[in-house]
Amino acid sequence: MKQIPEDIKKEIEKLVKELNYHNYRYYVLDSPVISDEEYDMMLRRLKELEEKWGYILPDSPTQRVGAAPSEKFEKAEHREPMLSLDNAFSIEELRDFDARVKRLLGSSEEVEYTVEPKYDGLAVELSYKDGLLYKASTRGDGYVGEDITQNIKTIKAIPLRIEGVDKIPEEIDIRGEVYLNIDEFERINKERIEKGEPVFANPRNAASGSVRQLDPSITASRRLYMSCYGIGYVKGIEFKSQIEFIEWLKKGRFPVPAYVKLAKGIEEVIEAIKEIEKLRQGYPFETDGAVVKVNSFELQRKLGTKTREPRWAIAYKYPAHQGITKLKDILASVGRTGVITPVAVLEPVKIGGVTVSRSTLHNWDEVERKDIRVGDYVIVERAGEVIPHIIGVVKDRRTGEEKEVKIPEHCPVCGSKTVREPGEVAVKCINFNCPAQVEERIKHFASRRAMNIEGLGDKTVELLHNKGIIKHFVDLYKLRQEDIKGLPGFAELSSKKLIEAIAKSKKTTLSRLLYALGISQVGEYASKLLAQHFRKLEDLYHIKAEKLVQIPQIGEKTAKTIEQFFNNEENLKAIEELKRMGLKVENPEFEEEKKPSPLKGLTFVITGTLPKPREEVKEMIEKAGGKVSSSVSKNTDYLLVGEDPGSKLAKAQALRVKTLSYEEFLKMLE
C-alpha cells in the first residue's frame, strides 16, 4: 500500500464518519440534513480517495455493496439460542401469561413489562466485535442459522460500526427483524408482475427472499429496513433491563421499534396493546401483533426458557381482519409493459373499518389455482391492515351459475392477440401502441422515482390522454398552460404550477431518465448500474447485449431488452426530441475506469490459520475481483494455505489444484 499523507488519511476518516452519520439521519431517523446531491458528491470523493490510496476503513459506506455472488450460504452458530415466542390470541391468554410469570417468580407484585409492535419480517442477529460488524446471520433453527453478512451490509440503516455510546462492548450480538415497508413490497411485486415473475405473497416473504439472495446486489436493489430489539451474547458491558438496552441501541444509532412502552402490570400492558392497534393503521410496515417482555434482565434469567421459547415474553396476535363478499367481476388490467393482470371487483365489504371493493389477483395462474369464478362468495383478508387479497372461495355457497374465468386471448383495450412466453406466468399484449400501455408509460415517466413531475398524478394523465392532449410522454414537454386551464381541477394557478413542475423536471440525472423511459426489465437498480458504466445517454445508442452483460449484475435477459430499446429508431427519435425541448441530463453516478482486478474470474478456497482474520482475507480477494468458495472442487483455481491446514489441502492435492502461501497470495495482489 502507498504511503498515505496524513491529511488524506484524515479526510477519508472524516468522510466515512460524516457519511455514516447522514445514513443514520436518512435511513433511521428519516430526517436528512443534507440534499441527495451533497451526499452523492461526498460519497464520490470518498470513492476517489479510496481507489487512489487504497486506504479503506471497514465501516466505510463503500463497503456495503460489492461482494461477489456466493454458491451457498455458510452455516453460522448462535452463541446464545435465538428462541421464538409463544403466542397469545386473546386478552385472557395475556392475563394467564402474567399470572404464570408471577407464580414462577413467587410474587404477587405487579411486574414491569415492555410492549412494542411485532414486526413481520426475517429474524436476524448482528454480531459486533470491538464495535465493528463482522457477522450477520439468520435465526435458522434457533441454534444454527446462515451467514448473510454481505447482504446485511447493504441495508443502510444498520451501523457497520457502533458509535455514539458511552461504552462499546468487546463483543455483542444484537437481534432484530429485517422487513420491507408496504410501498416497497408493492413496488417489488409490480416489478415482478411486469417481468412475468411470481409475486411474493406478503412483505415477510419478500423480506426473507430479499435477504437470502446469493447475489448481494439483488438485496441492495431493495429498500430493506431493520428494527433492533433483542440481545444475545454480550461481553464487556452489562444491561439491567430491556428499556436500558433499547436506549443504548438508540444512542448507538441502531433502528429500534417504532413504539416501546414501559408498562407496570398487565392492565397497562393491555392499554399499550390497544394503543398500538390504533397506531398500526398509520405504520408504513406490516404488524400483526405486539410483543410483551419482562423488563428486568435479572427476572428474565430467573424465569428462564422452555425448549423453544422464553418464559419471560409473549407475542399477542391481533384478530385477523377478514370478510366474505361476492365477486362481481374479474377485470383485465393492462400495465405499461403490456402485462395483463386480473383484478377482482367485489361487492363492497367492510374489513377492519375500511371498505374494500377491489383486490388484485396477481396473475391468471392464481385464479386457476384457487378456482375463483365470477359470482363466487370469496374470503377477503386485509393483510397487515393494508393490502386486501382473496384467500379462498366459499364453495358450499355456489349455485351453479358462477362463471369460470378464462385467460384473455386478446387485449381488453386494443384487441391485439395476447402472448404468453414458455415458463412465464405473465400474459402480455405486445402492441406497443396499445392505449392502455401508452397511458401507463406516461404515468411511469412522470412518477416520483422517475422524472418526478409534481402535481401530475394518475388521474391527470388519464384526463389528458383521454382528451387526446398527450399521446406520448414526449408530449408532456409540449404542454402549454392554455392546453390545461379550464380542464376539471385546473384553474389559473393550478395549471401554471403544473407547467412549472414539468419545466423543472427537464433537469434530471441519467439514472432517473433511464428508469423513466420504462425499458422492460430495467428498474431503479439496473438504471443506476447503467449510469455508473456509461457517461452519457448517447453512449447507449445502438448498444449490443454482448457489451452490456460485461457489467456485473446485468443478465442476458435484461441486456437483450436494453439492446432492443436502444436499437429502436422510434425510441431514439423520442429521446432526441426530449433533448430539443430542453432536457438537461447530469450523471453524478458515472465511475471512471477502475484499476484492474488482478484476481478477476479466479476462485479461491482458504484453509488453515492466516496472519489476518479469514473474513478480512475473503474481502481482499473479492475486492480484487476474485471469488471465495467454502469447498475444494475441480472449479477451484487456488487453495490459500495457512498454518495447520485441514483436509482441504489433501483434497486440493488429489485434484491437482494449485496451492498458495499467504506471501504468494499478497504478490498476486500487487
Swiss-Prot record:
The protein's Enzyme Commission number: 6.5.1.2
Enzyme class per UniProt: ligase
Pfam families with a match to the protein in the record: BRCT, DNA_ligase_aden, DNA_ligase_OB, DNA_ligase_ZBD, HHH_2, Nlig-Ia
Active site: 118 (n6-amp-lysine intermediate)
GO molecular function, one term: DNA binding
GO cellular component entries: cytosol
Cofactor: Mg(2+); Mn(2+)
Keyword flag Ligase: yes
Catalytic activity: NAD(+) + (deoxyribonucleotide)n-3'-hydroxyl + 5'-phospho-(deoxyribonucleotide)m = (deoxyribonucleotide)n+m + AMP + beta-nicotinamide D-nucleotide
Ranges for domain BRCT: 594-670
Protein residues bound to NAD(+): 36-40, 84-85, 116, 139, 177, 293, 317
Matches recorded under SUPFAM superfamilies: BRCT domain (SSF52113), DNA ligase/mRNA capping enzyme, catalytic domain (SSF56091), Nucleic acid-binding proteins (SSF50249), RuvA domain 2-like (SSF47781)
HAMAP family named among the record's database cross-references: DNA_ligase_A (MF_01588)
Role this protein plays: DNA ligase that catalyzes the formation of phosphodiester linkages between 5'-phosphoryl and 3'-hydroxyl groups in double-stranded DNA using NAD as a coenzyme and as the energy source for the reaction. It is essential for DNA replication and repair of damaged DNA.
Protein name: DNA ligase
Organism, scientific name: Thermodesulfovibrio yellowstonii (strain ATCC 51303 / DSM 11347 / YP87)
Underlying gene: ligA
